[in-house]
Amino acid sequence: MDNNEKTYELAFNIIVHAGESRSLSSEAMDAAEAYDFEKAEDLLKQANDEFLKCHEIQTDMLTKEANGEKNDLNVILIHSQDHLTMATMAMDNAKRWIKINKKLQKMEER
């Protein structure tokens, strides 16, 4: 496998895991809205696990680049970084949404 093919493979792996992370974060928000906080926290943990897979790929690429091994820069790799950013934002939003819904539930119980 040449370097360009390897870069595509890594980029697509980032896209897959980032997409799964984002989807799980969305499910966590739905669970929080239903006040199922145990499920929401579990889904958020799964989202983080998927995110860490992306981060590991990215860190490996950065380490290799720092050690002089060049990665081919292509649109798919750039696109994968967009997905990684969206996954990060989705997890951050899910964490906030869980907190907000916990407060809302307490207010409704009064």
Predicted regions and their residues:
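Terminal alpha-helical segments
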Residues: 1-110
